[in-house]
Amino acid sequence: MEIRITEKAAAELDNINADNLRIAVQGYGWSGPYFGLAQGEPQYGDVTIEKDGRTFAVEREIADVVNYLEIDYYKGWLRKGFQININGRSSSC
């Protein structure tokens, strides 16, 4: 599994001084699962991935079925936050 971080997401992660990040399923919708990104220690069964000086813990159920995750940051009029794109599809958090 590969993790990609866009320039906007990397800048925001630097801005908030984020480390030890965990990616997990936060719920399910019509188009599939929603993923969350939060600071936290790895949990039992997580896959740990180092990328650009950061440590990411990814839930095993995600790592087993996803080829790559792209972490992006969106800032708009009504909302802002990290967006996780999986295999070319998106999920917001």
Where do the PLM segments sit?
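Domain-level signature for proteins that mediate thiol-based redox and metal-cofactor handling
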Residues: 1-93
